[in-house]
Amino acid sequence: MSKKYDAGVKEYRDTYWTPDYVPLDTDLLACFKCTGQEGVPKEEVAAAVAAESSTGTWSTVWSELLTDLDFYKGRCYRIEDVPGDKEAFYAFIAYPLDLFEEGSITNVLTSLVGNVFGFKALRHLRLEDIRFPIAFIKCCAGPPNGIAVERDRMNKYGRPLLGCTIKPKLGLSGKNYGRVVYECLRGGLDFTKDDENINSQPFQRWQNRFEFVAEAIKLAEQETGERKGHYLNVTANTPEEMYERAEFAKELNQPIIMHDFITGGFTANTGLSKWCRANGMLLHIHRAMHAVIDRHPKHGIHFRVLAKCLRLSGGDQLHTGTVVGKLEGDRQTTLGYIDQLRESFVPEDRSRGNFFDQDWGSMPGVFAVASGGIHVWHMPALVAIFGDDSVLQFGGGTHGHPWGSAAGAAANRVALEACVKARNAGREIEKESRDILMEAGKHSPELAIALETWKEIKFEFDTVDKLDVQ
């Protein structure tokens, strides 16, 4: 007997609230933090999110009979209270994998964080976490190189990498920009970096910057005997211009380029990552605009989701905040999404904000980049928090040295090596940080001056987006 079509409107929970459902290994799972309008039951709010992010619409439609709606629909299978919040709750939703184009992060986000975020029944909605099934991960190319390959390319092992953003980030001519790059690299840094908003402005066209940077790197490598690099930002107004800049960096024999993945978009980022893999280029990723999306504790997308999506889309390095610097991010939350960038399997751990087990299979890892308001006094904590597979970037903490950028770079290099040596000797570098740094400063006038210069600089503000734990 054929199905009967009943026109009209019915409650979402009649179809999309399925508390008896057991998620499949192939399902894509999502955790949303929901705050509904007053008087709307939690089950109806959660079911509405499942419906509007999958197969649902506001009215029953006859064309539902032309497909197997029960197979394709998203299902809210669990609701949990948010600790310490009387209004919000977690909705756990399972989506069949066939709802998404293979390997397309753009398509996944269009469904999960599309029109549903403007739904009137919701006051706030936040995507807290996604469990990508291994079947989907295998369709994504991921990082173009990964941690091990990058270390081999740069010939750097056994410690975090050191970098800095060129300052002032806007206004320098190409030649003066190259001079600052040279000073930093000869002083001891591994990388220097374009800031996120340096593209091709009237004061410095991109070709000019690329050429002077390439010359600076060549001189610094000859002087130090080390492999050096600079993150050349190829983010552009069109994909064609982006690839033109990437090709020119390759012609100059540069090891690494950079992309602003949120403002540039996931489609552009995935394409650029594939280009980097095919052309032997490392890819540094900046997260400009992320806080607009992830900082509000009740609305938006948590950064752990953006970090997971970036690993799938492709990038070899990603900014993650610092814990100790000027940018938002507490220690446990930051460690949670650093794990998602680097590990092959990350277990559910609410104390770090991870709502699901996440199996990454054999996908390469991504370097976590600590950048934003850090200086030499932060070095012991940074080494302890981020470990070796990280890039520690000191912008003002390099250029602000009273003796200039080369001295600032030297101070950071000495501090880093002192902390790594102390850690390897079994010392508790966070507890013994002052002794370790002061001892190293006795043999490095650059470090001694840096320690004196920044001894009073702290960024002691409470975190806005805190973990929801009891």
From Swiss-Prot:
Record organism: Synechococcus sp. (strain CC9902)
HAMAP family, per database record: RuBisCO_L_type1
Disulfide cysteine pairs (residue numbers): none
Location (main, coarse): other
Family from the record: Belongs to the RuBisCO large chain family. Type I subfamily.
Name used for this protein in its record: Ribulose bisphosphate carboxylase large chain
Gene Ontology annotations for the cellular component aspect, listed alphabetically: carboxysome
SUPFAM superfamilies named among the record's database cross-references: RuBisCo, C-terminal domain (SSF51649), RuBisCO, large subunit, small (N-terminal) domain (SSF54966)
PANTHER family on file: RIBULOSE BISPHOSPHATE CARBOXYLASE (PTHR42704), RIBULOSE BISPHOSPHATE CARBOXYLASE LARGE CHAIN (PTHR42704:SF17)
